[in-house]
């Protein structure tokens, strides 16, 4: 069966949604890995911060968990007509860490879900 990384971009309704998806997937025999971005130490990305401090330790863990999954499910609310800062920041860190970050994203099935309100 498949391994699905479920990315919870916030720690409220979308985390509950992510946990519910995990239950359903596991009941169907899949492996689910709920990734709580709000609990990860990913400071706001800036070039100066990156040069001065390097990449945060949690970035390696995030990369590994995403790379190990066959597909991703992103649970994120709409924030002011866009995506939440936690999700944008995580993607930004991922895109600056490795020589070919696109290999992590290309060809991987991704689904989106939201609970907003």
Predicted features and spans:
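N-terminal beta1-alpha1 ligand-phosphate binding loop
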Residues: 2-30
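Hydrophobic/aromatic beta-strand patches that form the interior of the parallel beta-sheet core
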Residues: 5, 35, 111-113
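Cofactor-binding loop segments of dinucleotide-utilizing enzymes, especially the Rossmann-like FAD-
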Residues: 9-11, 37, 115-117
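Short alpha-helical
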Residues: 12, 40, 81-82
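Short N-terminal helix-initiation segments at or just after the protein's N-terminus
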Residues: 12-19, 52-61
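Short, glycine/charged-enriched secondary-structure capping and boundary segments
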Residues: 19-22, 47-50, 87-90
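N-terminal beta-loop-helix "entrance" segment that forms/cooperates
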Residues: 37-56
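Helix-loop-strand module that forms the ligand-binding subsite of alpha/beta enzymes
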Residues: 54-117
């Amino acid at each position: 069966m498949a391994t699905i990384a479920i990315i919870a971009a916030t720690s409220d309704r979308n985390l509950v949604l992510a946990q519910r998806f995990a239950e359903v997937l596991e009941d169907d025999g899949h492996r689910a890995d709920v990734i709580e971005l709000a609990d990860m130490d990913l400071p706001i990305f800036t070039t100066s911060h990156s040069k001065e401090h390097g990449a945060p330790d949690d970035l390696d863990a995030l990369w590994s968990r995403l790379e190990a999954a066959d597909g991703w499910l992103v649970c994120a609310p709409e924030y002011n007509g866009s995506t939440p800062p936690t999700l944008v920041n995580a993607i930004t860190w991922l895109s600056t860490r490795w020589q070919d970050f696109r290999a992590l994203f290309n060809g991987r099935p991704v689904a989106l879900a939201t609970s907003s309100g």
